Each structure stands twice: as structure tokens, then as C-alpha cells.
From Swiss-Prot:
UniProt entry tagged with the keyword Disulfide bond: no
Chain segments carrying region Disordered: 1-45
Protein name: Genome polyprotein
One cellular component (GO) term of this entry: viral capsid
Family: Belongs to the potyviridae genome polyprotein family.
Keyword DNA repair assigned: no
Post-translational modification, as annotated: Genome polyprotein of potyviruses undergoes post-translational proteolytic processing by the main proteinase NIa-pro resulting in the production of at least ten individual proteins. The P1 proteinase and the HC-pro cleave only their respective C-termini autocatalytically. 6K1 is essential for proper proteolytic separation of P3 from CI.
Alphabetical UniProt keywords: Capsid protein, Virion
Comp. bias regions, Basic and acidic residues: 9-36
Pfam families: Poty_coat
InterPro entries in UniProt: Poty_coat (IPR001592)
Length: 269
């Protein structure tokens, strides 16, 4: 009999505990989802669309040529659209071409790309460079031909190297943290502010994050580097032949090869 009473008491405790939990969950739900009084008054804050059909948008035969829903969501990486940077396909073609001519594997190319980037930081990416580029293996200089690097670079080597801009900037920062360092490009431009060393290479890619002072320094260095450069559209035409015969007769008494006499005067002694 006592056992029956205890069982009933335990059952009541379990039921009461469950009711308490259910009540607590209901209260939590009420706290999360607050009821709005239908009699309350208020003004909702209007949300304006950034691009609306009321704008003066391009039209063809009364139909808008833009997809506004797609345009609102279209936010590509800005640097991917720059025409001063080689496309991903052009960069991949350059990489595969260099790898094939050097006869290297992907792992070996990873080792080659590091010192080549550093070499370009120091020496630039001018299309006129030729000969060899150098990497250091301890204290030993190892030479590699520049021809595969330059000839496979389309459109230009500088546009290819724009892909290395962020990595080069981080490398210069690392070098500056361990001691005084200024790339050769900055030394030639006589850049005096060591804080701008991270921008002192000719394939630095200016973007929206670049500070005003850094942009000015990059522009001034580029202007100084190109100040004495003259580009000619046409060079000397080598396919030139004489199409007329010179039948002019000259004697030893002529003034010069283009003049017979000076109207009776002799040649000056």
C-alpha cells in the first residue's frame, strides 16, 4: 500500500514538472514573439530602392535593356575588370607556357615564381628587358633565361605581374619589418619616405584601398620613369631602294658635289 502511494506521488511530481516546463516554453515564446496591439499607431520607415525604373535608363523600342534585379546583385571584384591586368585565361596560358619551356613541374614552378617576383620588384617589368634573370640559392647565383617569361606574356609582362601585386606588397612589408629595405625602383626614383616602400615597384596595382598619399607617390614615380621615353610609331624603313639614276657630271673644279660654280667665283681657299 505504501508503495502504491509513493508511485502516485512520483507520477504527480513528473506531471507537475512537465507542466512547468511547458509553461516556461510558452513564456519564452511569448517573449520572443511580441504581440502588436492592433489599436496602436505608428509610421513605418520607407525603404528606397537604389535603382528604380523611374531613372533615365537605356531603352530600345520602349524596352529597357538592363536587368535591374541582376544589376543590383552584380558586385564583382573590381581588379578583375581592370584592362591593365591580364585575364585569368591569359595568366594561365603564360604559366603553362613558361612551365613547358623550362620543363618544370608545378611544385618546381612554385619555387621559381617566388624569386622571379622578387627579381621583378627590383628590376621592373619593362618590355625591353632581355638576357637572364637571377635567383639566389644560398650564396650562389642561379641564372634563368628571360625569353620564356617575356615571350609568353600576353598582352605584356607588366599586365601578367599585376596578379602578383598583393603578394609583392606583403613581401616588401615583411622585409621592412626585419630591417631597412627599399626596392631598387624606389631608390632610382629617390623615394625618401620608407613608409611608402611597399608601393615602390612598377607592377603595383592601384585600387580603391590605396591611400591618397600612396596614389600620388605611385603616379609621381611612374611619371619620373617615363619622362624621357619617346615612342615612335614608325621606325626607319629598311626596304628602300634607289629608283632614279643620278646623271649629274662633276669635275674637280666644282665647288661641291651639288654645285658646279659660284657664278664665276672660285672655291674658297
Amino acid at each position: 500500500k505504501d508503495e502504491i502511494i509513493d508511485a502516485e506521488a512520483d507520477a504527480k511530481k513528473v506531471v507537475s514538472k512537465k507542466d512547468t516546463q511547458d509553461a516556461g516554453e510558452v513564456n519564452k515564446g511569448k517573449e520572443k514573439d511580441k504581440d502588436v496591439n492592433a489599436g496602436s499607431k505608428g509610421s513605418g520607415v520607407p525603404r528606397l530602392q537604389k535603382i528604380t525604373k523611374k531613372m533615365n535608363l537605356p531603352m530600345v523600342k520602349g524596352n529597357m535593356v538592363l536587368d535591374l534585379d541582376h544589376l543590383i546583385e552584380y558586385k564583382p571584384d573590381q581588379t578583375k575588370l581592370f584592362n591593365t591586368r591580364a585575364t585569368d585565361a591569359q595568366f594561365a596560358t603564360w604559366y603553362e607556357g613558361v612551365k613547358a619551356e623550362y620543363e618544370l613541374s608545378d611544385d618546381q614552378m612554385g619555387v621559381i615564381m617566388n624569386p622571379f617576383m622578387v627579381w621583378c620588384i627590383e628590376n621592373g617589368t619593362s618590355p625591353d628587358i632581355n638576357g637572364v634573370w637571377v635567383m639566389m640559392d644560398g650564396d650562389e647565383q642561379v641564372e634563368y633565361p628571360l625569353k620564356p617569361m617575356v615571350e609568353n606574356a600576353k598582352p605584356t609582362l607588366r599586365q601578367i605581374m599585376h596578379h602578383f601585386s598583393d603578394a609583392a606588397e606583403a613581401y616588401i612589408e615583411m622585409r621592412c619589418a626585419s630591417g631597412p629595405y627599399m626596392p631598387r625602383y624606389g631608390l632610382l626614383r629617390n623615394l625618401r619616405d620608407k613608409n611608402l616602400a611597399r608601393y615602390a615597384f612598377d607592377f603595383y596595382e592601384v585600387n580603391a584601398k590605396t591611400s591618397d598619399r600612396a596614389r600620388e607617390a605611385v603616379a609621381q614615380m611612374k611619371a619620373a620613369a617615363l619622362s624621357n621615353v619617346t615612342n615612335k610609331l614608325f621606325g626607319l624603313d629598311g626596304n628602300v631602294a634607289t629608283i632614279s639614276e643620278d646623271t649629274e657630271r662633276h669635275t674637280a673644279r666644282d665647288v661641291n658635289q651639288n654645285m658646279h660654280t659660284l657664278l664665276g667665283m672660285g672655291a674658297p681657299q
